[in-house]
């Protein structure tokens, strides 16, 4: 994801170097970058798992892993594999049922000041088991969208700081405003404007 933000930072640097007034610029964020963000922020536990119930050492536990992000029309679809051992723990074993359904949620991207957020979460596919859905529904509709939120200004500032070392120019992002976004193919195109200083 750092390469994406470094190229974005270079775009801003070119605008600043040309002494142009603040105008809208397009940030292009690939599907893979959003998927990495989700995995880093939510699936950072042991073996890339997020435990909805229990822990890695629990006999009975429910976890999600293997998150995949795809773009469909104007929405972002997140698919996760769910593994559930539901029942009663007896002598270190889970006596009950094992389930491994795939769950899906779609959401719409939107601009939120300096950030790219996600809202209007709609459950596309969940389990047939009511007990499992009790855990999956809040996870998919709240935790997944909030974990995909990207602070664009913060990432650009970090990319600009690293460019200062190689260029000997102090480049800072003073302001960033996300206006609108749309999905084209495997890219989320974000219209932003901002101010950059070069010293």
Q: Which role fits each region the language model picked out?
A:
Residues 6-9, 30-32:
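Short helix-onset patch at the extreme N-terminus, typifying the N->h transition
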Residues 23-199:
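Extracellular/lumenal and peripheral-membrane lipid-interaction modules
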Residues 1-5:
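Positively charged n-region of N-terminal signal peptides that target proteins for export
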């Amino acid at each position: 994801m750092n390469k994406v933000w470094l190229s974005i930072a270079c775009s801003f640097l070119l605008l600043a170097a040309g002494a142009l007034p603040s105008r809208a610029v397009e940030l292009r964020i690939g599907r893979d970058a959003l998927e990495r963000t989700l995995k880093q922020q939510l699936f950072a536990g042991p073996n890339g798992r997020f435990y909805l119930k229990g822990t890695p050492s629990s006999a009975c536990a429910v976890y999600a892993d293997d998150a995949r992000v795809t773009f469909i029309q104007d929405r972002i679809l997140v698919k996760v594999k769910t593994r559930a051992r539901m029942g009663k723990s007896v002598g270190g074993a889970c006596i009950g049922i094992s389930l491994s359904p795939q769950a899906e949620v779609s959401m719409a991207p939107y601009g939120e000041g300096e950030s790219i957020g996600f809202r209007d979460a709609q459950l596309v596919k969940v389990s047939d088991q009511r007990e499992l859905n009790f855990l999956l529904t809040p996870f998919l509709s709240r935790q997944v969208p909030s974990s995909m939120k990207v602070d664009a200004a913060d990432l650009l500032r970090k990319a600009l700081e690293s460019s200062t070392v190689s260029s000997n120019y102090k480049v800072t992002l003073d302001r960033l405003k996300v206006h609108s976004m749309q999905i084209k193919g495997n890219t989320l195109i974000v219209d932003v404007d901002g101010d950059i200083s070069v010293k």
